[in-house]
């Protein structure tokens, strides 16, 4: 039997997983790497840490799977928007990678918005003018690394998101490529025409010579160096992490939606061939591109999901491990109706208020650890409903009635039941929780001829548990109204 290696390069760690051609998980390896915070609001990674952790985990996963030379394909999924610039000749980065969380270009984004450029940028790229995306990070590097822009114009420097940099390293510098989903997160890519946008590149003074070739999500991206795995292996699938999870959840029909719960939360709604422009400040993006055909999505991001549980553990110290929250929530006094708005780093979609800060409402003398745990978990459900309400308002065709979930917090039965209750719709949790790696393994396997196409893959998607709404509609709406008033109060401060 042939096997597929899925490389999952994330924000805090790199993971590698080996799947067989039936997409059964055979092995996992993971390695964390340091986060670099040069100044408040700045976040960087050393690209050598990204590469070394990927190389180490990839080799370890292959060894643990004991697959005896049957590795047939590689897929790559990655943290999106993070920027790497390196020398074409040597492969050496000219600066640390600037991570998607980095806010150093906030003033530049504000100036561009004040100059009236946001409507054009949003119309072309589907994105908001925000430091989150790659374009202004790349401009910052070209502005602040001596001689960088001139070298880029001479073809000496290359830009890439993390997938592109890893492909360059894996292939020994033979391929400078990316996929459409990663390109769509740079704020330089026209998602309607499927090309790098010359006008936006000109506005930011970014030489187009340094941009990678853009491919489908399932394509030949290059062959690895022979010394890495004993022979050259084709890289056949690439997608940004949230788009890979969308594929792993088999959200292939327009109207299907998934929500991934990690440190934050990312919800994607498949809108098919229709590119929907959001009126609620959601993002319009590419869900996946296969056979030259783009499928679009609306995306909403919540900054704080699983991170609110980390706050209970590391900040308030009312739990020792995340698993304790479910028991506390079950023992809480629901009548207290404590509300936590966890705007620790501002409010994400659909509010986009980076200056807002968190608050607790409804405190009484009897509010204790159990009530805080319950309110923290409930905040994730409320924020998810905010996203879904915005998606329904934006797209007349409407979302289907079921939300597919994955990520660490999806393991909590209590959280998923509350989510179903507060959105008033079923929540489906799959058997395979590693949907991001599964998605990119499927893309690579499909391109290799080992795995089925979308329809058959979707038919094989397996449900572990469905959570049906149990809360009375009047209670649901009263609770959600209270949440809305709390959010408005936070934004008013």
UniProtKB/Swiss-Prot annotation:
InterPro entries reported for this sequence: ATPase_NBD, Carb_kinase_FGGY, Carb_kinase_FGGY_CS, FGGY_C, FGGY_N, Glycerol_kin
An example Gene Ontology molecular-function term: glycerol kinase activity
Positions that bind ADP: 11, 15, 263, 306, 408
Pathway assigned in UniProt: Polyol metabolism; glycerol degradation via glycerol kinase pathway; sn-glycerol 3-phosphate from glycerol: step 1/1
Gene3D superfamilies (UniProt xref): 3.30.420.40
Ligand binding (glycerol): 80-81, 132, 241-242
Keywords: ATP-binding, Glycerol metabolism, Kinase, Nucleotide-binding, Transferase
Positions that bind ATP: 11-13, 263, 306, 310, 408
Enzyme Commission number(s): 2.7.1.30
Catalytic activity annotation: glycerol + ATP = sn-glycerol 3-phosphate + ADP + H(+)
Activity modulation notes: Inhibited by fructose 1,6-bisphosphate (FBP).
Record-level GO cellular component terms: cytosol
Broadest EC class assigned to this enzyme: transferase
GO biological process: glycerol catabolic process; glycerol metabolic process; glycerol-3-phosphate metabolic process
Binding positions (sn-glycerol 3-phosphate): 11, 80-81, 132, 241
Classification via Pfam families: FGGY_C (PF02782), FGGY_N (PF00370)
Matching NCBIfam families: glycerol_kin (TIGR01311), PRK00047.1 (NF000756)
Similarity comment: family membership: Belongs to the FGGY kinase family.
Function description: Key enzyme in the regulation of glycerol uptake and metabolism. Catalyzes the phosphorylation of glycerol to yield sn-glycerol 3-phosphate.
Protein name listed in UniProt: Glycerol kinase
Organism of provenance: Cereibacter sphaeroides (strain KD131 / KCTC 12085) (Rhodobacter sphaeroides)
């Amino acid at each position: 039997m042939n096997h597929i290696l899925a490389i999952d390069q994330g924000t805090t760690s790199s993971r590698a997983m080996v799947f067989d051609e039936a997409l059964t998980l055979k092995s996992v390896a993971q390695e964390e790497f340091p986060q670099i915070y040069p100044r408040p609001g700045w976040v960087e990674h050393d690209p050598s840490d990204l590469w070394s952790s990927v190389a180490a985990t990839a080799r370890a996963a292959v060894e643990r799977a004991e697959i005896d030379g049957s590795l047939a394909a590689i897929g790559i999924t990655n943290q999106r928007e993070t920027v790497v610039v390196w020398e074409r000749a040597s492969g050496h980065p000219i600066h640390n990678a600037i991570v998607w969380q980095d806010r150093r270009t906030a003033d530049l984004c504000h100036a561009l918005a004040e100059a009236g450029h946001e409507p054009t940028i949003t119309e072309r790229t589907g994105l908001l003018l925000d430091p989150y995306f790659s374009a202004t990070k790349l401009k910052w590097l070209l502005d602040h690394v001596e001689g960088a822009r001139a070298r880029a114009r001479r073809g000496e420097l290359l830009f890439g998101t993390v997938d592109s940099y890893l492909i360059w390293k894996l292939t020994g510098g033979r391929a400078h490529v990316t996929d459409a989903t990663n390109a769509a997160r740079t704020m330089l890519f026209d998602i309607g025409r499927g090309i790098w946008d010359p006008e936006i590149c000109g506005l930011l003074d970014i030489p187009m010579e340094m941009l990678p070739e853009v491919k489908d999500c399932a394509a030949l991206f290059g062959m690895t160096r022979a010394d890495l795995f004993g022979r050259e292996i084709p890289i056949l699938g690439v997608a940004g992490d949230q788009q890979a999870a969308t594929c792993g959840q088999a959200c292939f029909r327009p109207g299907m939606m998934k929500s991934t719960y990690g440190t934050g939360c990312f919800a994607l709604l498949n809108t098919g061939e229709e590119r929907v422009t959001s009126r609620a400040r959601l993002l319009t993006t590419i869900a996946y591109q296969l056979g030259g055909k783009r499928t679009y999505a609306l995306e909403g991001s919540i900054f704080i999901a699983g991170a609110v549980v980390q706050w209970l553990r590391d900040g308030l110290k009312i739990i020792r491990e995340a698993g304790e929250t479910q028991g506390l929530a079950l023992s809480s006094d629901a009548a207290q109706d404590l509300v936590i708005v966890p705007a620790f780093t501002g409010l994400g979609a659909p509010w986009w208020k980076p200056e807002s800060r968190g608050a607790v409402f409804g405190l009484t003398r009897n509010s204790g650890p159990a009530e805080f745990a319950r309110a923290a978990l409930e905040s994730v459900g409320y924020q998810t409903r905010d996203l879904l309400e915005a998606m329904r308002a934006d797209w007349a065709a409407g979302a289907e009635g079921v939300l597919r979930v994955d990520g660490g917090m999806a393991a909590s039965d209590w959280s998923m039941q509350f989510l179903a209750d507060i959105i008033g719709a079923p929540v489906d949790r799959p058997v395979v929780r590693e949907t991001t790696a599964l998605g990119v393994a499927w893309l690579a396997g499909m391109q290799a001829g080992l795995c089925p196409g979308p329809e058959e893959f979707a038919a094989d998607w397996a449900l572990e548990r469905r959570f049906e709404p149990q809360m009375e509609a009047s209670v649901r709406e009263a609770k959600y109204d209270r949440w809305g008033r709390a959010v408005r109060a936070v934004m008013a401060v």
